[in-house]
């Protein structure tokens, strides 16, 4: 009986843990300073809204305005597929590929804004919104 309860408890905990990202390489800047990845496995869809994560890995260590060093950033994009709008939340990390420690005092969240046509974000928007069907 105790083993059944333990297995049930572990199963419930695993159910509510966030899924581990599976990063797919989607591009590199012309100067190879930035490398872009998207987590296509964990895209969520709610009506007209699609939420997806994008990771940027930097070729060289970067420095925030507050003097903290980081190697990567993960952005959570929420797209309004009907209105062609996006909202972005960004977190920076001390190691490559979103590893190390997340910088505690470095959170950014944008207002809703238009997705500009012909930009890399426009391509990202199109691919992410395709998950609605």
Regions found by a protein language model. Give the residues of each.
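Short, low-complexity interaction segments enriched in Ser/Thr/Pro/Gly
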Residues: 1-2, 17
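Hydrophobic h-region of N-terminal signal peptides that target proteins for export
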Residues: 11-19
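Intrinsically disordered, low-complexity segments enriched in polar/charged small residues
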Residues: 9-10, 59
């Amino acid at each position: 009986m105790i083993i059944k309860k333990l297995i049930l408890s572990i199963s419930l905990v695993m159910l509510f843990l966030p899924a581990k990202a599976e990063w797919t390489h989607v591009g590199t800047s012309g100067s190879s300073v930035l490398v872009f990845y998207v987590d296509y496995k964990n895209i969520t869809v709610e009506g007209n809204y699609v939420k997806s994560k994008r990771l940027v890995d930097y070729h060289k260590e970067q420095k925030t305005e507050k003097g903290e060093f980081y190697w990567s950033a993960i952005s959570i994009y929420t797209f309004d597929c009907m209105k062609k709008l996006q909202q972005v939340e960004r977190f920076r990390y001390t190691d490559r590929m979103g590893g190390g420690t997340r910088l505690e005092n470095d959170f950014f969240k944008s207002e809703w804004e238009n997705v500009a046509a012909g930009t890399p974000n426009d391509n990202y928007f199109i691919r992410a919104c395709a998950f609605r069907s």
